[in-house]
Curated annotation (Swiss-Prot):
This is UPF0273 protein TM_0370. The lineage of its organism: Bacteria, Thermotogati, Thermotogota, Thermotogae, Thermotogales. PROSITE patterns: KAIC. Belongs to the UPF0273 family. It holds the Pfam family ATPase. PANTHER family: UPF0273 PROTEIN TM_0370.
Length: 242
């Protein structure tokens, strides 16, 4: 029997026929405003509720802002951080400013994947993390797209080796058909694509599981909403593509 990690996101585990296979690295891919970050934070929060420690690697936002954004949905990670069950790896401030001086896990040069890897390893070992989010992995290779696949592989080797189930947030432009970076889709175990489409003058959210190693899954596109408690997916309302 394959061990699975429950996302805890309403509707998602049904679509994945029980959850994400343990140790999988899953790309959460989509354009701006599609809900990628909320999806990832909800995954971490639900893990904490199930007793699974988590790490959030912040590459695009100040760690203080990450926590504020989570609190909007009632996800207060401070108690878990104090208990050593949750940590934010600060790969945003570059070690500048008073916040960074207090921060335990800081990556000073995001162009140095080895430094990120070392900080990440230490954070995972010290918190005994089972879930990891990197938001966004695109930031690591935006200036050197040819390195995208190699960077994904390096991080995958480390995180899978440490027993973590991980979500890598990947940005794509609104019109882009791919998943954000050349070859990244081959370096991950799963891809969940989030979309925001204009239909009859109204924006509609939907997602589709493009691939997921180790499990069967729904092949349909499913509508979802962002509520005051986070993302809710409607697994029985699969539309037939766009």
């Amino acid at each position: 029997m394959i061990k699975r990690v429950k996302t805890g996101i309403p509707g998602m585990d049904e679509i994945l026929h029980g959850g994400i296979p343990e140790r999988n690295i899953v790309l959460i891919s989509g354009g701006p405003g599609t809900g990628k970050t909320i999806f990832s934070q909800q995954f971490i929060w639900n893990g904490l509720q199930m007793g699974e420690p988590g790490i959030y690697v912040a590459l695009e936002e100040h760690p203080v802002q990450v926590k504020k954004n989570m609190e909007v949905f009632g996800w207060n990670v401070d108690p878990f951080e104090k208990e050593g069950k949750f940590a934010i790896v600060d790969a945003f401030t570059g070690g500048i400013g008073e916040y960074a001086e207090k921060e335990k896990y800081v990556v000073r040069d995001i162009d140095d994947v080895r430094e990120l890897a070392e900080v990440l390893k230490r954070a995972v070992r010290e918190t005994q993390a089972k879930r990891v989010v990197i938001d966004s992995v695109t930031t690591l290779y935006i200036t050197k797209p040819a390195m995208a696949r190699s960077i994904i592989f390096q991080l995958k080797r480390i995180l899978s080796g440490l027993g973590c189930t991980s979500l890598f947030v990947s940005q794509v432009s609104v019109t882009e058909k791919g998943f954000g970076g050349p070859g990244v889709e081959h370096g991950v175990d799963g891809i969940i694509r989030l979309d925001l489409d204009e239909i009859d003058g109204e924006l509609k959210r939907s997602l589709i599981v493009w691939k997921m190693r180790g499990t069967s899954h729904s092949m349909r596109r499913h509508p979802f909403e962002i509520t005051d408690k986070g993302i809710v997916i409607y697994p029985s309302e699969g539309g037939e593509g766009r």
